[in-house]
Amino acid sequence: MEAWRCVRKGYGHCVVGRGRYPMFPHHSRSLGRDWTTPWENLQRCCWNRHISSCMRWPGHYSRAPYPYFSSRHFSLNWRPPCLFESRTQFQYCNWRPDNLSQTSLIHLSSYVMNAEGDEPSSKRRKHQGVIKRNWEYICSHDKEKTKILGDKNVDPKCEDSENKFDFSVMSYNILSQDLLEDNSHLYRHCRRPVLHWSFRFPNILKEIKHFDADVLCLQEVQEDHYGAEIRPSLESLGYHCEYKMRTGRKPDGCAICFKHSKFSLLSVNPVEFFRPDISLLDRDNVGLVLLLQPKIPYAACPAICVANTHLLYNPRRGDIKLTQLAMLLAEISSVAHQKDGSFCPIVMCGDFNSVPGSPLYSFIKEGKLNYEGLPIGKVSGQEQSSRGQRILSIPIWPPNLGISQNCVYEVQQVPKVEKTDSDLTQTQLKQTEVLVTAEKLSSNLQHHFSLSSVYSHYFPDTGIPEVTTCHSRSAITVDYIFYSAEKEDVAGHPGAEVALVGGLKLLARLSLLTEQDLWTVNGLPNENNSSDHLPLLAKFRLEL
């Protein structure tokens, strides 16, 4: 053991040289030989630049197999127990060619902090540089989309017009500090100082100031930080803030903040997904729906409905996720409904904990879903295997939830008893917003909105997927900005037919990144990006 300690400390000469361990030089050479062959196999495998630690979602890039890693892939069966601690196990590491090529073939680090509190040398290494995210300007002409990269070369047909209202929206999961600390295994790749809230919040606020969005939809907003720092800071920047904390004893929630100069507040509608009377809905996620009136003095303008949510993470509870989504859509339908029967423009943001192409994602965009025979673990696309999973029940949620299969609040005809002058009783029907008569059982879900996604989820030139979150265990897209598009956009993204008062035109979006891009700066969080999610940002135009 003394010999091993000498090697681990990096000493060139040790007590072995004095003859106490005469066989140690022989074993050292043997160690190098035993490592060479597995290393060569590992090196060859890692030259595939598309290898990723994230799981493959439907419609994934066909040239990138994205395998699950295990020791059998790399012949890494030899592992001296005294050299590796549990926190450095292979399945938690992100193997990147740029790091591996710079590492010696025999790396014998104990990953133990010294008495002065310094971090391991592998974590002290800083990844320098900032990845630039470009604006992508998108204009629609005769149902054909033109995309221009950069801030200067704007299509002339996208220039300002008189009868319009332009605004920008940011959706950002800012990573609750309590959740970060409770799930520290997801951030083993990070330097410890960048994980402190005192370091992270100034960075997050700097991003918000830089992008200067008119509307902010924030998730994982910790309640104590919101009251002490986040809300006062945003109010000083000209925002009005509304917040909905998660139910139960959860410390975070969702916030929607908007610029006083752009909007006035018409209504605030929090949505709690926990229902004590329904066993299915035993989770504490929430949503928040605001109705905002654009401030345009010279023209009449419809209100804009903005929704924000953070759906359940659990990949194996797709039944709960779909029910939470239905509850949010029902509230949006109630808030966005106009007196003439139409719906005002809608922007729906959040962390949906579902990947592109999944049944839940398709339901949002297409406006319909037949879930008959669908395993609950397949709903969000996070689970690859459906083995041992039960099938979604029909219907998914019980009648007493008060929401129909069309994702709207149901109206029941409830008998009301009144007395007449002759003391006779008669039954009179009265409308209420409480449920409910049982519908004919159907496995078809629908909603009333034609929603498009701001992002396309894949880079068109390469087919490599965009990433909105990246930590030690995955790098995928789970964050979205959906919007009710004008007709020429809807033609490219078929959805439910609905009457809209105008529609939103997507003018621009802030480009996303690939997993490979993010690992060049040591993933998320890092020195410049202080959440494990990227902020999503879009610019819209409402034609008047």
From Swiss-Prot:
One of its GO terms (biological process) is negative regulation of mitotic cell cycle. Gene3D superfamilies: Endonuclease/exonuclease/phosphatase (3.60.10.10). GO terms for cellular component: Cajal body; cytoplasm; mitochondrial matrix; mitochondrion. InterPro entries: ANGEL2_N (IPR045816), CCR4/nocturin_mRNA_transcr (IPR050410), Endo/exonu/phosph_ase_sf (IPR036691), Endo/exonuclease/phosphatase (IPR005135). It comes from the Eukaryota. GO terms for molecular function: catalytic activity; mRNA 3'-UTR binding. Belongs to the CCR4/nocturin family. This is Protein angel homolog 2.
